[in-house]
Every structure is written in C-alpha cells, then in structure tokens.
C-alpha cells in the first residue's frame, strides 16, 4: 500500500498540540503507511480571554473555526479530523459533522492547585473569604455548596497562564481549580495539591477524554478511528453526553457526572448532579444499566438518568439559570 497523508487539526495551546500529537502517534503506530501532519489553529474561545466562559453560552466556543476546515474548498487546506478535549465539544454537532472516536480517558477528576509556597492543603483549610479561581460554574456551584466560606472569581487563559497568575504575589486567588488531565498531559502533575474524588466534586461531561470530530460518513477514516477509540471510555462518555444533551445543557451549565463501566459484567453506572449557580439547590441521581449494544445502550442510560434528575428537581434548577448572552 502506498503512503497516504492524514491532516489532524486542533487548538493552538500547548495542551491542545500535545493532544493532537498523541493522536498522530497512535495513527502512525497502527498505520505506518500514513504520514500525519498537525495543524494548530486559534478559536474564538482562545481569542477572547476577557469574558468568563459562561458569557459565551457555551456553544461551539472551541470548535467552529476548526470545523470550517473539514469542508474547506481548497483541498490543500482541508483537514481530515479535529482533536478536541471532549468536554469542550457541543453535544449537538452541526449537520455534516460527527464524533468519530473517543480516546482512552486520562483521570477525569478536577483538582486543587494552591499558589506556590502556600501552607494550605485543602479548600477546608482556607480562611473565610479566600478567593478561589475557576472559570467553570459547574465547579464553583458545587464548591459553594460544600465550602460556603469561600469566594469564587473567574480565571481565564491556558493552564500555564493560569498558574503564572496564581503564583503572582499580587494575585487575589489563593488557589485555582483545574482538570487533572490537563496537568497530567503537560507534565505538571507536581502542581496538584489535591485531586477531588466524586464525593467532593463530580467532573464535567467527557472530561479527561479526547473527542475526534470528522466529516459525516468519511469511510476512509472509520478503520483508522477504530484503532484510536477506547471502548470503556467511549461507553462512559457517550452516556454522559446523552445525559447533557437530554437536559439541553451547553458546556457552561452546572452538570456534574461520574461514570464507571465494568467490562466483566457489562454494567454501566452513571451518577449525575445538577446544581444551582449559588450552590443552594441540587438534584442528584444514579442509574446502573446493562450494556448489550454499546452506543444505543450508553445513550439510553444517559436519557434514563436525565429523566431521574428531572424528577429530582433538575428542571426547576435549569429553568432558573439565565446565563448572559454572548
């Protein structure tokens, strides 16, 4: 078989490039006849750093500029796939685009990062009125519920920028909350002060996994993506995305999840939480679901949990959230 070229694109941040390169390595290992190139492109979410994430409404914030390249008329500029942090991918993709594969998940938890030299080890240790930096209302809403003595402020920028801001003596934040996976992929695991297990915080839908977006029905890529995809992570993440899609929440709505799939018993367990922005109200539920058909049953599991959460009061919470227009 002759040599073929595959064009992989992602965002321009250091973390995004590492993620794109990781997919390139898998493809070239499994398909030595392919030469892969990586394109790094800026998106709207990268360009506008002055607004908190919820102010954008959460739709296509990190994706549109890249999606345009999948159908670029100039074939020399056209790409074949986009590597996203799955948590940043809208659960409803535009017509002509599909989620082609989900990679093996890195630790999906959120974590606490204290400023350099801080004597504090947990959020409970912090004095009253301490400022915690996070750009996610899912994180701040859950933490407000557990730690009412703390104050929360929006912190934007890539991970290195956020860490630099945190360590600046003039900075008001005592700590920041980040996705564990990002620090692990960047080799910055030593900055993690505490990983939050599911008793402290439920993570974002799809967190820790990479989602690969392609043109709908691109048969050439299907055999390639089958080697990139991870079954366990795919089942869990499809269920999580189904939950969010059913609740009609963008990535800025405070929905937390935790999922596990037991490959021996084929049982998928999915926990979900919808919490009000101020942390005062919450709806929680759990479902266990026997997986016989991976995609269909994972989606059904998410829909079932959504129905349980709505019964538990999630609709009232979601209806009360009026996010600013972009």
From Swiss-Prot:
Enzyme class, first EC level, given as a word? transferase
**Record keywords:** Heme biosynthesis, Porphyrin biosynthesis, Transferase
* S-(dipyrrolylmethanemethyl)cysteine found at: 251
SUPFAM superfamilies recorded? Periplasmic binding protein-like II, Porphobilinogen deaminase (hydroxymethylbilane synthase), C-terminal domain
Q: Which GO terms describe its molecular function?
A: hydroxymethylbilane synthase activity
Annotated membrane-spanning segments are none
Q: Which reaction does it catalyse?
A: 4 porphobilinogen + H2O = hydroxymethylbilane + 4 NH4(+)
Which Pfam family, any one, appears in the UniProt record?
A: Porphobil_deamC
Annotated GO biological processes are:
heme biosynthetic process; protoporphyrinogen IX biosynthetic process
* Matches recorded under InterPro entries: HemC, Porphobilin_deaminase_cofac_BS, Porphobilin_deaminase_N, Porphobilinogen_deaminase_C, Porphobilinogen_deaminase_C_sf
Q: In which pathway does it act?
A: Porphyrin-containing compound metabolism; protoporphyrin-IX biosynthesis; coproporphyrinogen-III from 5-aminolevulinate: step 2/4
Q: What is its EC number?
A: 2.5.1.61
> Where does this protein have coiled-coil stretches?
none
Question: What does the UniProt function comment say about this protein?
Answer: Tetrapolymerization of the monopyrrole PBG into the hydroxymethylbilane pre-uroporphyrinogen in several discrete steps.
Additional note from the record: The porphobilinogen subunits are added to the dipyrromethan group.
NCBIfam families with a match to the protein in the record: hemC (TIGR00212)
Q: Can you say what this protein is called?
A: Porphobilinogen deaminase
Which organism does this sequence originate in?
Answer: Eremothecium gossypii (strain ATCC 10895 / CBS 109.51 / FGSC 9923 / NRRL Y-1056)
Q: Which gene encodes it?
A: HEM3
